Amino acid sequence: CMGRHPSRWGGLLLWLLLLPLCCTAETAAGERGGELSGLSAEDRINLLCLRSAYPQIRAVESGPDGIWLRLEGERRVLYASAAELAAHPYDDATLLDREQRLARRLDPARMDVSLRASMHLPYLPDPERAATPLGYSPGRWRSYAFLKALYGADAATVRRGLGVTSLQGRKVRMSGAAVRALAAVDGRLREAVRQRPELKPWLVSAGGFLWRPIAGEQRLSPHSFGIAIDLSPQRAPYWRWARMERHPLQQSYDSEIVRAFEAEGFIWGGKWHEYDLMHFEYRPEIMAKARVLHQLETAGGSGLEGLPGGAERDGGTVASPHDLSGVGAAEGSNG
């Protein structure tokens, strides 16, 4: 888990800084199948964070159709197509004008994106909580091909990979690594609750695994893959229920709870425009990238701009929540 192995991520950061732009498939941590030279700094960080987060990934392979991840069992998942790599990076995910953003928000099916696009929006670890304008929901964009390859494409397959742990004495079913991460979260919070009993009512599990669609959508919920847990929904609402453009709890929700989850690879739905304040989702690749970028910034750089071939790409820059501020702010959350 990230919170328990800081040296692991420090080593990853050092390796990123030393990794040359022209690395080949054979030299970049076992990637094979063709040249991976010329990738942006962000793509290199994404691929390294994916491999560090998921031991099921055996290799990264490139070919005329794009870049693929090869998983155990010879399964392959597309990281990014050749067309996506050749176009302005992440055009399909975030760099959209106001009308396009609104159309995308009203078409949630299009939030099933490539792995590359799913990792682009920067997730900011607590205590930092940026504004969440329309279009800013880091981690709510998902690659369902990747989730199905990791956990199963149907309920029966996912169930076979479930384990059971507990949070504050309540049993929770989650998938493999997520169940181990939740057990570590429970360990972190046990002492916090002992010292601050007022936290306990916020930590009532409303369930982990449940094969179902997202409320109001046709996409599968991450609960379907056993990687999400909801806590105390009566206290921490979902945007469709609250019908508020922004919710005060997005800023005031207890940081000790959020930090305990983030330290073990979970992201919090309170950092989304379409906020889900009860929702914690196991996405270790996103938290790994968040910590790498934070280390780059605190080391004296400015995130991706501190790496060779960094943020500026084909006339565009890496999006940040601050870049998106004010976009669509007048729209209500009715999608």
Residue ranges and their predicted role:
Residues 34-55:
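Short Lys/Arg-enriched alpha/beta "domain-start" segment
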Residues 263, 276-278, 283-335:
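Low-complexity, Gly/Ser/Thr/Pro-rich intrinsically disordered linker/tail segments
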Residues 49-271:
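Cell-envelope/glycan interface and biosynthesis
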Residues 11-21:
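Bacterial N-terminal signal peptides
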Residues 2-13:
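Bacterial N-terminal signal peptides that target proteins for export
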Residues 21-33:
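Bacterial Sec-dependent signal peptides at the C-terminal "C-region" and cleavage site
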Residues 3, 24-25, 223:
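Residue-level detector of bioactive/disordered segments in secreted/extracellular proteins
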